[in-house]
Design a protein with these regions (language model features):
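Hydrophobic transmembrane alpha-helices
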Residues: 2-72, 77
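Hydrophobic alpha-helical transmembrane segments
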Residues: 13-20, 59-63, 80-84, 114-122, ...
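Membrane-embedded alpha-helical hairpins and interfacial helices in multi-pass inner-membrane proteins
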Residues: 31-41, 75-80, 100-231
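Hydrophobic core segments of transmembrane alpha-helices in multi-pass, intramembrane catalytic enzymes
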Residues: 42-46, 85-90, 184
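A compact, surface-exposed functional segment
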Residues: 67-74, 80-94
Length: 233
């Protein structure tokens, strides 16, 4: 009992640490995209990776990203609102990729790209709606006019055609979010798969038995937590 509790605590702490690292990587990638004038957000790729490890890791990654945004950019109200978009990513990744019924499907290579593509489209739709609502609220209450340049250009293109601001803010986000979330989902899951493979090979070399490809050491060394243990939500 005490040994199991110690393993769970160790796994929890390592998931928290990995989530913080993911937050730093997200902010670094986002700043690089701004510096290189890439018309994407590029701030959630490692949130996807972290979410593949577990709920704890994904949520900590989301919190870390927006906390670091306050440090880097100063206090901006949108960091509080768009934090919910990051949480949406965590929820969607866990529910669409790691529920028990989805787990078996993901083990078949042929369906994996399709499931990832569906996840990217769902994320683009939901987060575009969330982002549009937040943008509309911010611009109505605070005259907020900061954001992704490509999105802003599309918003004002729609507005000049007499499309209502809320609809404009939502529609303008979808094409950018679709590309951004597809990159985040495929890139983030790809990094997770590589790390999973490395840990599985290490276990096999140590003579450990890995029961299935998703029975992954979520702490990368401590606190074994199978992916399907998170299904009870």
């Amino acid at each position: 009992m005490m040994k199991n509790n110690a393993l769970k605590l160790r796994g929890f702490l390592i998931q928290c640490a990995a989530g913080i690292v993911a937050g730093f990587l997200n902010i670094a990638l986002s700043l690089a995209a701004i510096k290189l004038h890439v018309p994407l957000f590029m701030d959630t790729l490692f949130t996807v990776t972290a979410s593949c490890f577990g709920w704890t890791c994904g949520i900590v990654a989301a919190v870390s990203l927006h906390t670091l945004s306050f440090v880097v950019h100063g206090f901006m109200l949108q960091n509080l609102t768009f934090f919910f978009c990051s949480l949406t990513m965590v929820v969607c990744v866990r529910l669409m990729l790691f529920r028990k019924n989805a787990l078996n499907t993901m083990e078949h290579g042929g369906s994996k790209p399709l499931r990832l593509l569906i996840l990217a489209i769902v994320l683009a739709l939901v987060i575009s709606l969330e982002g549009g609502l937040f943008y509309y609220a911010l611009i109505s209450l605070t005259k907020y006019n900061i954001g992704n340049q490509a999105v802003n250009m599309l918003i004002y293109t729609f507005v000049t055609q007499n499309v209502p601001m809320l609809i404009s803010a939502t529609l303008a986000r979808f094409p950018v979010n679709l590309v951004d979330k597809a990159a985040a989902v495929f890139g983030g899951y790809g990094i997770f798969a590589l790390l999973q493979k490395a840990v599985t090979q290490r276990k096999n070399s140590d003579g450990s038995k890995v029961e299935n490809s998703f029975a992954f050491d979520s702490g990368m060394g401590g606190g074994i937590e199978n992916a399907d243990e998170y299904d009870e939500i």
